[in-house]
C-alpha cells in the first residue's frame, strides 16, 4: 500500500497547490507480494480520462530490484524522468535513450536510519519533488505529517536534500 498512498499524496499536493490530479492503483492478477503499480496524472486543467498511463513522463521506482522482473521504462516518453531508490552510484545507473533526467537517492538506508524500517515511499516523495518540481514540497510534507507524523515528514525533507540529479545529453 506504500506505493498507492504515495501516489495519493502526490495528487493531494498537486490539488492543494492549485492544479488537478488523479491516482489509479493497479494490483494485477498476482497474489500478495507481487509488484504494485500506481499511476498518477497531473495537469493544470481537469483530467477526464481515468485510465492507466501507457506513456509516462516520469517513472518512480521504490525498489530497484523490480527492474529485474519488470520493464519499468516501458512506454516512457521522450525526455522522460526516472526517480530511483538505489545504492548504486549515479554513473552506474543505466537508462534508455528516452530518459533525459535521473534522480537517485538511497531511500532504504535513510528510512532505516530515521524510522528503523525500510519504508521507502515517503523518502521517494521527497526525491520526486526535488527532481521534477511538479508539486510543492511543503504540501507533500504537510500531508505526510498528517498521515504518518513528524518523523516521516522529516524523512521526506531529508531525502529531498540528499537526492542526486543527473541531466543527460548535456541538458544540464
Each language-model region and where it sits:
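Active-site cofactor/cluster-binding pocket
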Residues: 1-172
Amino acid at each position: 500500500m506504500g506505493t498507492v498512498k504515495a501516489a495519493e499524496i502526490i495528487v493531494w499536493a498537486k490539488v492543494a497547490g492549485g492544479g488537478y490530479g488523479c491516482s489509479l492503483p493497479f494490483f494485477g492478477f498476482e497474489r500478495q507480494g507481487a509488484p504494485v503499480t500506481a499511476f498518477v496524472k497531473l495537469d493544470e486543467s481537469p483530467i477526464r480520462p481515468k485510465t492507466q498511463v501507457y506513456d509516462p513522463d516520469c517513472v518512480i521506482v521504490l525498489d530497484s530490484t523490480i527492474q529485474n522482473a519488470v520493464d519499468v521504462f516501458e512506454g516512457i516518453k521522450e525526455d522522460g524522468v526516472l526517480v530511483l531508490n538505489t545504492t548504486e552510484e549515479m554513473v552506474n545507473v543505466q537508462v534508455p535513450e528516452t530518459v533525459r533526467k535521473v534522480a537517485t537517492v538511497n531511500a532504504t538506508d535513510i528510512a532505516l536510519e530515521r524510522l528503523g524500517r525500510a519504508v521507502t515511499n515517503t523518502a521517494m516523495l521527497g526525491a520526486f519533488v526535488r527532481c521534477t518540481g511538479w508539486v510543492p514540497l511543503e504540501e507533500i510534507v504537510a500531508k505526510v505529517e498528517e498521515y504518518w507524523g513528524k518523523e516521516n515528514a522529516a524523512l521526506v525533507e531529508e531525502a529531498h536534500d540528499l537526492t542526486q540529479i543527473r541531466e543527460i545529453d548535456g541538458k544540464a
